Amino acid sequence: RPEMERFKRHTRANYYTPGSPVQFVCVELLKGELSGENAVCLTFKNISKVTLTALEIHFKCKGVDGIILCEDAFEYREIEVKPGESFGMDDAVFVTQKAITSVDVVLKNVYSGKKVVHLDAIKRVRLPAPRRLSPELEKALESRMNRTGLKYMPQVFENGWYCACGSFHPKEEDTVYCTECGCDRILLQN
């Protein structure tokens, strides 16, 4: 992917699928330095206790004025994703010359060996937007946690929690540690 690194836009998912062993984390839009094409890469995380071997999704990419540029299915096959690991970020699901303004992802089926979990009947839950900290609070929290990039108010909801780095952890993940920045939820809350 070295040719695709010039331009990168990273957008976190603003919804999640309750009960799913896999979480849709973010969309990355990469622009080719030579081709000028936009590649859509999706990142998912295994939040279960088992190794995942395949994932089937449906996605829709929209351009300017909400025009659908692509609507398709994509399969991540022959993968071996251990609990807590992320995947998909190296696979372009769609490449276009046009500007992409939004990407919608629906989880269909996830596999662990021969076992399958059907997710298409589960209604997705929209996440509240993470709340930005004031610059003073941001500095104080980063200093206390000895980390940078903590720009958001840590929040706990009935369906999960937001870390100060902006990462959402659904209750299905069952962790007090942020898998993205390593912060401890309990320390963040105090």
Residue ranges and their predicted role:
Residues 7-16, 88-141:
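Terminal connector regions
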Residues 32-35, 154-155:
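Short, solvent-exposed loop/linker segments at the N-terminal edge
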Residues 57-59:
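Hydrophobic beta-strand segments
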